[in-house]
């Protein structure tokens, strides 16, 4: 690898950060943006005119990998230097570098603290040896509470002091557990100006789901301390963020490595109390770890969306066992019933895999039964495919590609129908809509049961009898509305009154 002092970037050089995949990657890109900005780079999300393009890749499933490759190739056609970072780069390392000569460098997560020097080396024409991938779970202690002591790069876990490399401008800042949140340094630079932002609770995963390769390249589960999260939440609020979306590989596990397996229940009201934040949304919940206290905290805490992003993956017990997961149709329905007993209008979404090795017609029928009874607001259906290095890739009982596609098409159509029906059940109900955008008079936002990008949206229309002035609404406004129509999973609603106006907006 190139040493940290092999190149020094010049002020004003333009770098584009292109982000693929999940919201966790978006947070990682904003950490990279902060590190680069601290060294004088002009950071953009538009590749036009950039001297170097960094593609923060996704390596989750085959389609995501193909999207990453296509983005890297398209970036190379602009004439800019191209650098692959992110999950696919971490997962394949030297193999990716050898197969993709269009990329001048393939970086590991371990390169992130020195990203400025790495890009400087690329522009100087210095070759950077790609890493040999390794199982990042083995880099951290088996005992969860000792993991934060390990010197391992964890994207999204940086501090401002860490941003100062050999050529950096940021002075180290000493903090301890007594430092107030508003005085803690934050290593992040927003690449989006919208009223919603993700807040990364943790990285990695300790589960061993047979189909998933993520723990091997993201590592074991490591939580961020509450005080660090509160500092970042306050900083995000000062930039205009109104909704925080809590992300990780498994948010239900938050705090177990901090000695407090109930830490998320305590953190939620603290985040909701941050000045300027009107909604906190938890995501990536594991059903087996979604305990009654966590259900209650999400369902009843003021300022926290009654929204349950539950990773069911299937509902047939035999399939779940082969996946190395836990649960059944009845257990999952009981969990949803406990949610709705506390918050009848709570939102619920999940993803499901069809065609997993050994899946039978009876298993599919059981999944169909669950979907028909679950009343989920949003359903994602994925067709199974073997992933390198996973246990499932070596399982017997593979389902033919033709059968997988048939089941995928059937379940996808059912999901669309059921989610549209669930949306219709909200007709006449009152929802709180956070305005995301106002474009040519079209006001669009999301109700509490709608997460950004994946769960549909709510379009606001002018009330017939006066009331809220639609033309006066701005991104970041939180508005009480009545649902008047639906379009698939999307809602149409009339604003009844302002709950909380976005601060600092001229009206």
Swiss-Prot record:
**All copies of domain Radical SAM core, residue ranges:** 191-422
One of its Pfam families is: TRAM_2
User: How far does the signal peptide extend, from start to end residue?
Assistant: none
Q: Which organism is it from?
A: Salinispora arenicola (strain CNS-205)
Gene Ontology cellular component?
cytosol
Q: Which residue range or ranges hold the TRAM domain?
A: 424-497
Q: Where does [4Fe-4S] cluster 1 bind?
A: 22, 58, 87
The record ties this protein, via PROSITE patterns, to: MTTASE_N, MTTASE_RADICAL, RADICAL_SAM
Supply the SMART domains for this chain.
Answer: Elp3
- Write out the biased-composition intervals (Low complexity): 155-172
The primary site where this protein sits is cytoplasm
Catalysed transformations (reactions) = L-aspartate(89)-[ribosomal protein uS12]-hydrogen + (sulfur carrier)-SH + AH2 + 2 S-adenosyl-L-methionine = 3-methylsulfanyl-L-aspartate(89)-[ribosomal protein uS12]-hydrogen + (sulfur carrier)-H + 5'-deoxyadenosine + L-methionine + A + S-adenosyl-L-homocysteine + 2 H(+)
General function of this protein: Catalyzes the methylthiolation of an aspartic acid residue of ribosomal protein uS12.
Q: Which residues form the MTTase N-terminal domain?
A: 13-124
Q: Where in the cell is it found?
A: Cytoplasm
Cofactor: how bound: Binds 2 [4Fe-4S] clusters. One cluster is coordinated with 3 cysteines and an exchangeable S-adenosyl-L-methionine.
Q: Which cofactor does it need?
A: [4Fe-4S] cluster
Judged by the first EC level, this protein's enzyme class is transferase
Q: What is this protein called?
A: Ribosomal protein uS12 methylthiotransferase RimO
Which family is annotated?
Belongs to the methylthiotransferase family. RimO subfamily.
Write down the CDD domains for this protein, in alphabetical order.
Radical_SAM
**What Gene3D superfamilies does UniProt report for this protein, alphabetically?**
Methylthiotransferase, N-terminal domain (3.40.50.12160), Nucleic acid-binding proteins (2.40.50.140), tm_1862 like domain (3.80.30.20)
Q: Where is this region: Disordered?
A: 150-175
* InterPro entries registered for this protein in UniProt: Elp3/MiaA/NifB-like_rSAM, Methylthiotransferase_CS, Methylthiotransferase_N, Methylthiotransferase_N_sf, NA-bd_OB-fold, Ribosomal_uS12_MeSTrfase_RimO, rSAM, rSAM_horseshoe
Ordered alphabetically, the record's keywords are: 4Fe-4S, Cytoplasm, Iron, Iron-sulfur, Metal-binding, S-adenosyl-L-methionine, Transferase
């Amino acid at each position: 690898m190139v040493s940290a002092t092999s190149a020094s970037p010049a002020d004003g050089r333009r770098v584009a950060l292109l982000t693929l995949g999940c919201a966790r990657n978006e947070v990682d890109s904003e950490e990279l943006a902060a590190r680069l900005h601290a060294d004088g780079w002009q950071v953009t999300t538009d590749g036009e005119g950039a001297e170097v393009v960094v593609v923060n890749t996704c390596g989750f499933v085959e389609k995501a990998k193909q999207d990453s490759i296509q983005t890297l190739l398209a970036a190379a056609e602009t004439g800019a230097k191209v650098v692959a970072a992110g999950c696919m780069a971490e997962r394949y390392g030297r193999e990716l570098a050898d197969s993709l000569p269009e990329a001048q460098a393939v970086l590991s997560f371990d390169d992130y603290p020195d990203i400025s020097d790495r890009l400087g080396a690329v522009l100087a024409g210095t070759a950077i040896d790609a890493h040999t991938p390794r199982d990042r779970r083995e880099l951290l202690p088996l005992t969860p509470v000792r993991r934060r002591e390990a010197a391992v790069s964890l994207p999204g876990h940086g501090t401002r002091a860490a941003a100062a490399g050999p050529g950096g401008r940021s002075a180290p800042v000493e903090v301890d557990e007594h430092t107030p949140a508003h005085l803690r340094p934050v290593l992040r630079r927003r690449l989006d100006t919208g009223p919603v932002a993700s807040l990364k609770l943790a990285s990695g995963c300790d589960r061993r789901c047979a189909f998933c390769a993520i723990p091997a390249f993201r590592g074991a589960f490591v939580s961020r301390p509450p005080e660090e999260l509160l500092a970042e939440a306050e900083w995000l609020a000062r930039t205009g963020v109104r909704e925080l979306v809590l992300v990780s590989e498994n948010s239900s596990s938050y705090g177990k490595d901090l000695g407090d397996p109930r830490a998320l229940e305590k953190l939620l009201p603290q985040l909701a109390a941050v000045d300027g934040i009107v909604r906190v949304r938890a995501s990536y919940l594991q059903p087996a770890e979604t305990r009654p206290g966590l259900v209650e905290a999400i369902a009843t805490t003021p300022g926290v969306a009654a929204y349950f992003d539950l990773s069911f993956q299937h509902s047939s017990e035999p399939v779940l066992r082969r996946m190395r997961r836990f649960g059944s149709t009845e257990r999952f329905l009981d969990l949803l019933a406990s949610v709705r007993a506390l918050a009848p209008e709570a939102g619920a979404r999940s993803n499901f895999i069809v065609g997993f090795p050994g899946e039978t017609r009876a298993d599919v029928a059981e999944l169909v039964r669950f979907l028909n009874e679950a009343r989920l607001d949003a359903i994602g259906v994925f067709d199974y495919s073997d992933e390198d290095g996973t246990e499932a890739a070596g399982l017997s009982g593979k389902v033919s590609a033709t059968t997988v596609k048939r089941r995928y098409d059937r379940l996808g159509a059912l999901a669309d129908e059921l989610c549209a029906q669930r949306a219709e059940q909200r007709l006449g109900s009152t929802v709180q809509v956070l305005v995301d955008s106002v474009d040519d008079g079209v006001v669009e936002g999301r109700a509490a049961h709608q997460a950004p990008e994946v769960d549909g949206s709510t379009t606001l229309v002018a009330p017939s009898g006066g009331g809220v002035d639609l033309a006066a609404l701005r991104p970041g406004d939180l508005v009480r509305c009545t649902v008047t129509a639906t379009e698939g999973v999307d809602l149409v609603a009339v604003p009844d009154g302002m709950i909380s106006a976005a601060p600092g907006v001229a009206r």
